[in-house]
Design a protein with these regions (language model features):
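Active-site-adjacent beta->alpha loops and helix N-cap segments on the catalytic face
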Residues: 1-4, 18-23, 42-59, 80-83, ...
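Short beta-strand/loop segments at the ligand-binding rim of alpha/beta enzyme cores
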Residues: 2-12, 60-76
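Glycine-enriched alpha-helix->loop->beta-strand junction motifs that scaffold or abut catalytic
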Residues: 2-10, 27-35, 87-92
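Active-site beta-loop-alpha junctions enriched in small/polar residues
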Residues: 12-16, 38-39, 74-80, 96-98
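Extended, intrinsically disordered, low-complexity segments
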Residues: 16, 114-127
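Catalytic cores of alpha/beta
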Residues: 17-28, 64-66, 70-91
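Glycine-rich phosphate-binding active-site loops on the catalytic face of alpha/beta enzymes
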Residues: 34-44, 87-107
């Protein structure tokens, strides 16, 4: 139904996804797959080193490469560690954005301007 309505369905992979399930997800996914870097709730602190996360990411990327799909990393990605993930197809920083919005509102600042500035800084760390 998603493709029929021009909606991209983003599926998730995690460190505990089995190879057989992973292949099914990769085959049925659209242009992008979200790799949940760790078992945690959103906004959690990074568990394990970026090197360990990228090791798992690269294993998945080898499987995906043949299908030309993007693999983005999320969970635990912050302004402090984002440059470690330069080699990924993309990084999800949802909790960082939510924190910036909350802080902006609390300080009676423009959240759109502050989020935009934060994203520019993050972009400069990975490009």
């Amino acid at each position: 139904k998603c493709k029929k309505n021009s909606i991209s369905f983003v599926q998730l992979l995690s460190p505990t996804t089995s190879i057989s399930r992973m292949k099914k997800i990769i085959n049925s996914s659209h242009e992008m797959i979200y790799y949940i870097s760790m078992l945690s709730t959103t906004g959690g602190k990074l568990k394990g080193s970026p090197r360990e996360i990228l090791k798992n990411y690269n294993k998945i990327k080898k499987i995906i490469k043949k299908r030309k799909k993007n693999l983005v990393i999320g969970f635990g990605i912050t302004s402090k560690n984002i440059s470690s993930f330069k080699s990924s197809d993309g990084c999800v920083v949802g909790s960082e954005i939510c924190k910036k919005i909350s802080k902006s509102i609390k300080n009676r600042q423009n959240p759109v301007t502050n989020v935009n500035n934060m994203l520019r800084k993050l972009k400069s760390k990975i490009l």
